[in-house]
Each structure stands twice: as structure tokens, then as C-alpha cells.
């Protein structure tokens, strides 16, 4: 075993979505957890997202600067039951990764709360970003670089690049490792690996991953 992935919910409830902090009471001593993992010569990467719940510090700071989008994203509901109960919307919103100040804020919380305790890499989920029940007006959402309609496909490039550039500026002692759900041309320069999305566990699906990966690589 070389690597372990810490999936979502280490932050607690959906209203604290992607707080970039170990707020779940099950994680009483995250630093010791990292030390124990490293003591067994393993590494850990952690799930981080493009959206923030309304009770998080990143949300409040980004909201003050008008650096959050208003379209619907994941999680849709504050309730953790399935299907989503829209009587209790989560209020989660996607951050403007095109904005340099927003990328600074995003990294600040990664660095202070996650990298500082020994996280080795980043599992960047929802880097498309997730956009549910779209309406035409959503694509007119203003970003730092123009309308969302014009720059939407480059979102993963900007979000992943922001994490890479900031980590490189902080230290060169550890290589940057990023696993991202989405990509854009040129993203390989950011030390980013891409997976083929949310799939099921079957031999048939595994078989399809091989040509998918080869074609993805050939496309650059």
C-alpha cells in the first residue's frame, strides 16, 4: 500500500461542505493520523471541492468579495439522506477559480488546515464544476475573465493551476500531486492526473478504462 484517499465528510455536515478543515468529531487528532500513516511509509491525499457550504470560513470570505457563483451545485440538500430533500437546500456555491484573489483564498485554507498537518496530495473533485439543473441565465454568470459561457471549459485548468502554483511557491521539498475529475488542454504541467469520473465497480467498466485512458492521453 502506497497511498490512501481520505474522501469527503471529514468536515462534518453539508452546511460545512468543503470547509477544508477536520470538523467531523470522528477526526479528533488529524495530525497524529498523518504521522501514523507516514510512519507506515504510506501517503494520503484528501478530497477537496470547488463549492463551499454557507457555514464555512472560505464561503464567508469569498462571498464578501463577490467571488461565488449562484447556480446550483453539489450538494443540493443540507440533509444527508438520499434522494436530496430540497426543502432544505444546502446553499453550497462554487468559487470563481478564474479570480486570482479567489485562488489565493482557496489555497490559504488548504495550506493552514490541511497541508500543515501533513497531507501529501489533493484529490480535486467537481472540477468541472458540478452544475445542476442549468438554465440559460446560468451561463451569463460573470467571472473574473468574462461570462461563464465563454470560459467554462477552462475551469479545471484554473482551479488545479491555482493549487499547484501556490504549493510550489510555498515549498519545493515535496512534489505537487493532484488527482482531478476534469481537465483542460495543458493541464499536465500542473502535476495533475485525471480519472474518468464516477464509475461503478465491475470488470466491464474496468475494461473500458484502458481505451479511455489511452485516448485521453493521446488527446493531450
Descriptions of predicted regions:
Residues 1-220:
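Catalytic-domain carbohydrate-binding cleft regions of carbohydrate-active enzymes
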